[in-house]
Structure formats: C-alpha cells, structure tokens
C-alpha cells in the first residue's frame, strides 16, 4: 500500500464529510448512478474508479454490484468520512487513494471511471483525460457530471474563495468535442437534475448540470 493510500481505521465519525452528505447530494448521486446502471452494462467482475470521490456517494452505490471500487480524492476530511462509512458498514472491496490522479498507479485496468462534479476543479483536462485512457480497459467508459457554463453557484460563498476553480462550468457540446479530440471514440450527453444552493443572502440558487458518457477506444 502506497503512502498515499488510507490504511487507518476510523471509529469516530469525522464531521467534514458528514456535512457534505446531505439529502440533496445523496439524491443527486443516486440519480447519477441509476442512470449509469441503465446506460452501461457492468459485470460482477468490473472495477470502478471514482475520481474526486469526496465521501464516496457515487462509488458506494456500486459497491455490492462490482468486484472493486477505487476512490480517489485530495481531501483528507472527505476521505476520512468515507473510511468511516466503509469501516462501519463492513465494506472490504475498495481502495482509497489520497493524492492527485497523475500519481495514481494500478496494475489492473478499470471498466468505468466516474467524475462527479469535479472537472471544474481541474486545470489541465487534456492530461487528466490521457491518464483516464491509460487506466481504462479497451472500450471502457467515462461518466462525467458537472455544471453548465457560468452556473450561478460560481458566484456564491465557498465557490468564490476556498475552492480551486479553473473552469466556471462547461458547454457540454464543446466538452464532447474536446473529449473526442483527446482520444475517446464516442460521447453522449444526458439530462440530469439541477443542483440547488443557498446564496449568500439565503436565497435559492439553481444551477443546471449535465452528464456525459464517453467510451474509450
């Protein structure tokens, strides 16, 4: 196990991730994974990489249906809470990688990579997608959910300061063109629910999202 991987048991509930797992994030994650299950036929032997996994809301929805889930993130607090959830639920078929994707190495290729609400944090998308292709099995899938370009949530609270934010959302059609230029052979855009945040003055801020399912060569 590399020094980037979690190998500690967590018996006390960490608070950072607990705050993240609210009814909306849980519901949106389930909507995403239900749609993936409808669109992609994964075998019991499948391996999934949950990129920017946070507290594991996407990957944990597959944990009983595939052989292994790899959770990647750079947030200690989120991953501590994910570790706590796995420990308390007796989950064994997973790996937690605490570090940047460029440093991730695996001797096994993966069937599906999920990137839920994380791409707008990544500066060099081309390098990231090259890494994804390196990790995917032939004809493997990448599933992205993110915010549409200039979503209102980029103007409120946390997304104004303590986040790294190289992209203010994406135009899904343009992103599909880029994804194909980076080596994926098929892309499809799907509709998903909007996300609602509380604005700086307590108002409701609705931001549209999209899903892209891409297939590697």
Enumerate the language-model features and the residues they cover.
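A conserved beta-strand element that flanks and buttresses the S-adenosyl-L-methionine
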Residues: 114
């Amino acid at each position: 196990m590399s020094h980037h991987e979690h190998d500690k048991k967590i018996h006390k509930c960490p608070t950072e991730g607990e705050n993240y797992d609210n009814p909306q994030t849980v519901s949106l994650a389930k909507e995403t994974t239900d749609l993936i299950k409808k669109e992609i036929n994964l075998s019991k032997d499948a391996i999934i990489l949950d990129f920017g996994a946070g507290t594991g809301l996407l990957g944990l929805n597959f944990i009983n249906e595939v052989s292994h889930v790899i959770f990647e993130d750079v947030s200690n607090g989120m991953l501590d809470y994910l570790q706590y959830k796995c420990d308390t639920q007796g989950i064994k078929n997973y790996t937690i990688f605490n570090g940047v994707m460029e440093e991730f190495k695996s001797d096994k290729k993966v069937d599906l990579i999920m990137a839920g609400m994380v791409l707008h944090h990544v500066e060099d998308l081309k390098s990231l997608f090259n890494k994804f292709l390196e990790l995917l099995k032939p004809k493997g899938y990448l599933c992205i959910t993110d915010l549409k370009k200039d979503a209102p949530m980029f103007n409120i609270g946390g997304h104004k300061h303590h986040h790294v934010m190289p992209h203010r959302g994406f135009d899904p059609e343009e992103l599909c063109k880029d994804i194909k230029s980076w080596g994926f052979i098929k892309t499809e855009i799907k509709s998903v629910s909007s996300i609602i945040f509380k604005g700086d003055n307590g108002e409701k801020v609705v931001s549209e999202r999209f899903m892209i399912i891409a297939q590697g060569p």
